[in-house]
């Protein structure tokens, strides 16, 4: 009986090293546009609890974007003035938490002339 109680208690206990959810972008609409174009990024774990900042990156330069709206599955932003026409950027997220990380996303946006 005592063994059964210990076993149930062990199985019900949360893991000692629970990992924070990782933000992930799965799509951006539209996929191209001019500076000033509003974009909607969809994915998971995109709320303020997990995402501190959003960037466009070409692998050399990172351009911070202003997040206008944000919830668990969407972020709305505008393509900033520093973006260069003709460049196809990846989205990049700065996470929150004890150990913030910059994570490049598999989602791209092309800035039009």
Question: What is each of the regions a protein language model found here?
Answer:
Residues 4-6, 16:
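Cleavable N-terminal signal peptides
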Residues 17-113:
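Ser/Thr/Pro-rich low-complexity tracts
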């Amino acid at each position: 009986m005592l063994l059964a109680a210990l076993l149930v208690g062990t199985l019900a206990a949360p893991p000692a090293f629970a990992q924070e959810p990782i933000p992930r972008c799965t799509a951006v609409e539209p996929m191209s546009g001019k500076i000033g174009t509003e974009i909607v990024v969809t994915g998971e774990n995109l709320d303020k609890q997990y995402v501190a900042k959003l960037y466009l990156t070409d692998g050399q330069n990172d351009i911070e974007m202003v997040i206008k709206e944000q919830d668990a599955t969407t972020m709305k932003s505008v393509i900033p003035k520093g973006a260069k026409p003709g460049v196809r950027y990846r989205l990049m997220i700065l996470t929150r938490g004890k150990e913030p990380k910059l994570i490049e996303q598999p989602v791209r946006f092309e800035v039009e002339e």
